[in-house]
Amino acid sequence: MKLKNLALALTAVCAAPVWADNAVSLIPLPQTVKMEQGTFEFSKKLKTAVDAYPGDSIQWVLDNFEKNFTATTGVKFQTGKMGKAALQLKLNSSLAAEAYNLKVDEKQITIEAARPAGFFYALQTLQQLLPTRAVLAGKAVGEDVKLTLPAVSVSDAPKFGWRGFMLDEGRHFYGKEEIKKVLDVMAAYKMNRFHWHLTEDQGWRIEITKYPELTATGAWRNSKVLGWGDTKPDGQRYGGYYTQEDAREIVRYAKERFIEIVPEVDIPGHSQAAVASYPDFLACDPGMKHEVWLWQGVSPDVINVANPKAVQFAKDVIDELTNIFPFGYIHLGGDECPTTKWEQNKDCQKLLAEIGSKNYRDLQINFYKQLKEHIAKKPADQQRHLIFWNEVLHGNTQPLGNDITIMAWVGANQAAKEAAKRGMNTILSPQIPYYINRKQSKLPTEPHSQGHGTETVEAVYNYVPLQDVPADLQNRYMGVQANFWTEWVEDASTVQYLMLPRLAAVAEAGWTQQNLRSYPDFLKRLQKEVEYYQQKGVNYGKHVMEAK
């Protein structure tokens, strides 16, 4: 059988993958793809066979795939025998946890993987190989579409274990169905970490049963628009929050897509909504008026870390989050925490002297130290690793140890390198260009947001995560993450427009080896995503697709 190279195993100095005339369009680009002659044609019934696995979790992957595939295509699945079934999921223990091999010929589809995640990602690739993106989008396939797969061999594995996206719902609230759409798109691009920014000065979005005022008061503010410059608060009652059952529903939804959810409660800074809910023990100046913030920027109204009740509050919040979100990481923020009110508070002044420091930033470190010690006392299945924004590095991190993770955003390359040198793990989330809430073009039609339109799809794609990182530090780099802040973004359609297709570019940086990446090649493959976005019913940057 004559083979045609779709993507060659290239060295770092070589050109982009060579595309055949009949090349398929896959994002993220796999390690190797070889097109063969022939096609696999689906009939009305598909016999399947699955190797046994603890908990039947590979069968669970296939069952979830079957629900969508049958609903969108009408193809019925039947249990067959290994070796004879048309779709076979076979264990291959030599592969890495998220790796897979996918082979399609005229008679069979064979998938090999070592873990359920690998089978899931192979099935995502399979859906991209279909002649229509309808199945991937969960929509019915048109009667005029002949359901086939090209004969192909794919060998694939991700570059990074952390391939993330953060959405800020503290500033604006979008609701369960919109979050599920985000998770669907992430899954299509093999992203596996949803960082859920749930608290801010402008809103608290997660139910904490021990502190009901967090959502009774903290989830609501007196303006939908956030004030900035000439833009003033509009006086409209605005807000919303997720009950714990809502959050658990989303956790289950994400799990089916092999996405882990990382909750973030940003404390002790970015906490005016919490302070407004419980000023008696969270405020540095409880005698003053406190309300959920109506403005953009950073509020000076931070949590009083010298109040034992405030420390207990934080511990209680972590306890409830642990029972909602099973993933082994919790993000506690740590960025942009003004120390002005601490400097004016006698208890904070006293605590600073007691810990033997003159740097008020160390009060924040001391606060985190107490929370970390609290978590360490929990049963093993309830312990969590802590993630912080890289401003934490401005203090003396020695009390925290090096078993924390630094999410590097401002001066990201240098901050990540500094964290790695301190023996900490790090995640690259550079403000420029991975803050994809920023304008993605200079067109007059661009929605109002931060930036000057220079964070284009091309700029996002061309960021090189491990550039100039010494080899002995690279094992500290967990992966990459795009972030989306919502000060200016009031509706889900604008989130989608700014997010897409830039999220696909970040996904490819997280999955595809650097020596295979090329923007012209990516842009060519990106054209197929127009159908996916339209079928999915999501907004996107149409100007990118027109710039072929």
Residue ranges of model-derived segments:
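Active-site neighborhood of glycoside hydrolase catalytic domains
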Residues: 274-280, 292-404, 409-418
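Bacterial Sec-dependent N-terminal signal peptides
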Residues: 1-25
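Soluble non-cytosolic domains of exported or imported proteins
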Residues: 55-60, 116-121, 173-177, 241-245, ...
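Active-site beta-loop-alpha junctions enriched in small/polar residues
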Residues: 170, 199-203, 266-270, 335-339, ...
